[in-house]
């Protein structure tokens, strides 16, 4: 069994050693819940990593959105290169759930676009949890949604070992039952092909590796891992475990039992609808369900099969569905990052899902059992969660209640950086004063973050600053994840000096070059100007030794008073620690080096250069294939900036290839 092993030039420093010891002591004494209060830049992720290494327990880390999950995943992957660090988020690029609007008699069919790369990573996560113990899974709230039963998923697994006998037809049938597709022409993930005595399988958890099974009669002689693009053999394997191409695979006996259960519920529901004098709903439900039953009988699956999941898992009405939590071993560890946001999000998931499905059931689009295809209720999540460490700079009421108000603080930063100086100025002429402060900050070579209350104000302010020739951009909720990363990169590199936003300048936005955070209309009490929001926003200036925060307010609100007082308290503790240990604050600059790597890829390669570099189509095609692999690899590692650059370069090269051919 592999143990967790951190590979890093850094060692715990500042408050980290004490916090690590306290959390581990709490885990050893069987505390179910602990609170790690970590301020911005205090090294929360590195602290979590050290706790994982020392406890040596499989770990799930929950984040409240995909961007933060990706950030934590990337950091953990770099810290634990020899261990399994996995990513588990929703695999939908686009998702429109089925819904019915009774007022207009409008039924909206389910429509979705699945991201193959993220689906692959979800399979890799569940596979790792079933195969090994040195596993860290970084997940969004997706982990509380229904997933195939781990028992069935493992039961359906095909275990392959050289020297064993496997009747060929039986093996091919097993692969089909695992929802692998036979394709002897287009070999891609989730497919298998047959060539003579060889069977090639492209596993669901790989994007660039496949397995070749070499037989002599029914005896499996060798298993080779190979590159599906070039055919090059990469390794000889002692064994291979083939898991389902879907988390909802199940044996035929289970399907047959489920069909019986669905038919029984259908008859009861039809009788109920008839008794309510609802002929349209009766006919609709019968037609839709009979079609699904036909598909299940013939293929073992149907569109929207997850709505019948209760019958496949053998659970009773109202019981919680199987989720990722059931794949975790009993001694697993859970970290809830930015818990002040994540916990309320978990609490809200169930009600929204049920409200939509209840309408579908009432109007004959779904059986009542569809209500059991759902996320966990908050109470269920609270029951299922293993020993938990909540992580936040601003703990919420649930975490404080669970931990009895006891927190483990991470206030001293390893870099010696202080919480920023907070200045309160009148809001009357806030824009004019902001421009003056911007000039000073930009002249020092730093960047400016400005947060407003409304989208209209953010747009107007951005346009006004651009008219005044300030390099300004606006970050809003409609910006795609990759575009968001590009905007932040441009800010870091100085292509942009000022970034304006509303509620996007809070958790997880780390800009070491930020010298000023300006909070407009800070005295307008509400969600965006609450104590928690203000502390989180103030934290954006805490990665620069010269960082300042200006709160524009005409009156002192309770939220401003508490946020500024807490920041001052932390700043004084940090100053005393620095003076005692002779530490000089240093601006964080490590992330800048990561950007330098992306610049090695020239995305501005034009077609003329391509013709010069590659004098024939064959050479160019080989290079294009190589770049495609690199792009997919970058995407799988969530290195989005690199993937975008490679994508742009590929587009240019493919145009050049057309001209050469």
Swiss-Prot record:
Gene Ontology terms, MF aspect: ATP binding; ATP hydrolysis activity; DNA binding; excinuclease ABC activity; helicase activity
Motif (Beta-hairpin): 91-114
Binding sites annotated in the UniProt record for ATP: 38-45
Pfam family, one: Helicase_C
Superkingdom of the source species: Bacteria
A GO CC term attached to the entry: cytoplasm
Location within or outside the cell: Cytoplasm
Alphabetical UniProt keywords: ATP-binding, Cytoplasm, DNA damage, DNA excision, DNA repair, Excision nuclease, Helicase, Hydrolase, Nucleotide-binding, SOS response
Gene Ontology process terms (BP): nucleotide-excision repair; SOS response
Domain Helicase C-terminal: 430-592
Xref: PROSITE patterns: HELICASE_ATP_BIND_1 (PS51192), HELICASE_CTER (PS51194), UVR (PS50151)
Domain UVR: 621-656
Residue ranges occupied by any Helicase ATP-binding domain in the UniProt entry: 25-182
InterPro entries tied to this protein: Helicase/UvrB_N, Helicase_ATP-bd, Helicase_C-like, P-loop_NTPase, UVR_dom, UVR_dom_sf, UvrB, UvrB_inter
Subunit structure and binding partners: Forms a heterotetramer with UvrA during the search for lesions. Interacts with UvrC in an incision complex.
General function of this protein: The UvrABC repair system catalyzes the recognition and processing of DNA lesions. A damage recognition complex composed of 2 UvrA and 2 UvrB subunits scans DNA for abnormalities. Upon binding of the UvrA(2)B(2) complex to a putative damaged site, the DNA wraps around one UvrB monomer. DNA wrap is dependent on ATP binding by UvrB and probably causes local melting of the DNA helix, facilitating insertion of UvrB beta-hairpin between the DNA strands. Then UvrB probes one DNA strand for the presence of a lesion.
Domain notes: The beta-hairpin motif is involved in DNA binding.
Similarity field: Belongs to the UvrB family.
Protein name per the record: UvrABC system protein B
Organism listed in the record: Rickettsia africae (strain ESF-5)
